[in-house]
Amino acid sequence: VSSLADVNKTPNWLDENGDVNTPYNGVEATYLPGVGSGSYAGSFNGGFFGQTEVEHPFNFYENINASNSQGVDMSVSATGVGTNGYATALSLLSNKDEYSFNLLMLPGVIDQETDHSPVVSQAIQLCEDRGDCFLVYDNTNLTDAVSDAKTNTEARNSSYAATYYPWVQIQDATTGNFRFVPPSVVMAGVYHFNDVVGQPWFAPAGLNRGGIDSAVRAYRKLTQANRDDLYDSNSNPIASFPGQGVTVFGQKTTQKKASALDRVNVRRLLINLKTFVASSSRGLVFEQNTSNLRNQFLNVVNPYMEQVQSNQGLNAFRVVMDDSNNTPETIDRNMLVGQIFLQPTKTAEFIVLDFVVQPT
């Protein structure tokens, strides 16, 4: 999804039966979980090459499964287009020179579905291998309980992925009908809004940046105990508050080990920094490996790190690229080595206030 406007256009694709409106036929493929590059246009309906549109009506507000394939063959076979089709798409996205993106979502692919789980596994592996993108995935069906979300989330362990619960209801702008969609459909807009009004290293959650304006209501209204149970299992709750609408109220990754990287904002901070440093370093390749080259790197990276620090992304940092890590042996191996030490800022997720009544 390229902008928040694209997310808001989603309901216009549907008629009152939930099928694709004729004027949008062919356009929807741009936003479905496929990729387009040259002759490759996605994994739908058996077409790997030259196919640019979905050929049958679909209900985008429903999850894809064995009994409701929505035209997507999710079978596993050497020539099939199901998990192998998604595998082809994800393999293409592994080419960092060809594709540049920082968020990956697979609407309609539900992790708990047998045929979908390998797709989610490959998507997580893709993000970990690239190191410059983050996955938001779905792991529950519409009617699944809180306990299902907990169990399914606990089966994953990655700081490059996050999942949310429950599904939310959006309105078809054309007909006024209401449709339930998996969280990944609306989370694209939440992340986009967070980055526009804040920074990528801010938490895409809470009343200031986590509101889901397109959502009418959540499928389940979670109690505080529900939210706590979900958060303990690294599943991010979507809450409903009186007068404040539907709001994302969590920002954990699925990483099990407690560290700074078990939070979405910290992982996305590192993704942002890695992307900048990698881009800045590309022009240094094949230059003379002298102190001038090291200073050139420091003169680009340090100001950017200071900017991130001033925008509340870092408490402290230190960039080391000198004789201590660029020894004569290192230089003889045609290598330039740098180390970046970071102290990321943390979010306030629990506010404790003590009221003390004092005597007059």
Question: Where do the model's predicted regions map?
Answer:
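Structured, hydrophobic secondary-structure cores that serve as assembly/anchoring elements
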Residues: 1-360
